Swiss-Prot record:
Keywords: Growth factor, Secreted. PANTHER family: FIBROBLAST GROWTH FACTOR. One of its GO terms (cellular component) is extracellular region. PROSITE patterns: HBGF_FGF. This is Fibroblast growth factor 20. The keyword Secreted applies. CDD domains: beta-trefoil_FGF20. Belongs to the heparin-binding growth factors family. Neurotrophic factor that regulates central nervous development and function. It comes from Mus musculus (Mouse).
Amino acid sequence: MAPLTEVGAFLGGLEGLSQQVGSHFLLPPAGERPPLLGERRGALERGARGGPGSVELAHLHGILRRRQLYCRTGFHLQILPDGTVQGTRQDHSLFGILEFISVAVGLVSIRGVDSGLYLGMNDKGELYGSEKLTSECIFREQFEENWYNTYSSNIYKHGDTGRRYFVALNKDGTPRDGARSKRHQKFTHFLPRPVDPERVPELYKDLLMYT
């Protein structure tokens, strides 16, 4: 098995291939036809029409990476076991180690490794941790000009302007109302940071048989 540093270097090298849509891209399993973008987006939109967060999307799969999500306000986003989403200044907090899963080009789900909960946003723009992967847990990842990423709800947006609800953290680390957040605000700017497996070895035993 390749050393963890080699695995990290490999994943890091792949990230640069997708700057136009963020830091993720798709690799279909061997022997499968790559799903078309329209097919996946269509499935997500059909789920949204079934009611807010009502459709499970556990069948969607793609590239999985582990990262910390650092906000320009100075906090790492973390998902607690009780479903609370908040910021922490602690580097390599167990609840701040997140799995990024590409479900379509430019669309990702974010799951807390330790809590096992997916990042979700409801129709009020509130962030929460979800036990199931639903349409409320799919976000549009956009690579911005300032080298930060933004994450906006794939299903919720303002009807009058079309502006989407954004994942955001306030200056005190509390989650910011996604309906009031905008792309140009630093509350919405996030930087995916690499995870050092040696800092959180308990989270890597099952994934890479790391001991």
